[in-house]
Design a protein with these regions (language model features):
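Intrinsically disordered, low-complexity basic tails/linkers immediately adjacent to helix-turn-helix/homeobox/MYB/SANT
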Residues: 86-112
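Short alpha-helical "packing" element that flanks the helix-turn-helix/winged-helix DNA-binding module
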Residues: 31-41
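Short, Lys/Arg-enriched N-terminal segment that forms or immediately precedes the first helix
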Residues: 12-26
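C-terminal flanking helix
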Residues: 78-85
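Short, solvent-exposed segments of well-ordered alpha helices
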Residues: 22-30, 64, 68, 99
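N-terminal leader segment of winged-helix/HTH proteins
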Residues: 1-14, 84, 91
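Helix-turn-helix DNA-binding module
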Residues: 44-66
Length: 112
């Protein structure tokens, strides 16, 4: 799949109504989410390994993104995801998930 195919897939994914709602309420910026998707899934979509400068060119922005800027945004996204996972682990360890306060969120996550 060519660059246009990957970008079309990326744009379609980011415009999904459920993705928009979840992303809006997450700790990831739109740019971080886009960068993370490119890093994790673009090689599968492209059908070949990609270098980071190639991944940087897949961003949807018209401005040229350097490999360094791509990697910096990717690192920020990864740190935010890791912190979110640690937050979930902490709340689980402290028994917060057993509280009824989070029931509606747990129910929603089970329906996804």
């Amino acid at each position: 799949m060519q660059k246009n195919g990957v970008q079309l897939w990326l744009k379609k994914s980011l415009e999904d109504p459920l993705v928009k709602i979840l992303a809006k309420n997450s700790h990831l910026t739109k740019t971080q989410l886009e960068t993370l998707l490119i890093d994790v899934l673009a090689e599968n979509i492209a059908g070949k390994p990609l270098k980071y400068d190639e991944k940087a060119r897949l961003r949807l922005t018209k401005a040229k993104i350097s490999r360094g800027a791509f990697n910096r945004t990717l690192r920020q996204a990864q740190e935010n995801v890791i912190k979110a996972i640690y937050t979930v682990l902490l709340l689980g360890y402290l028994g917060i998930f057993e509280s009824t306060a989070l029931d509606k969120y747990i129910e929603i996550s089970n329906k996804l």
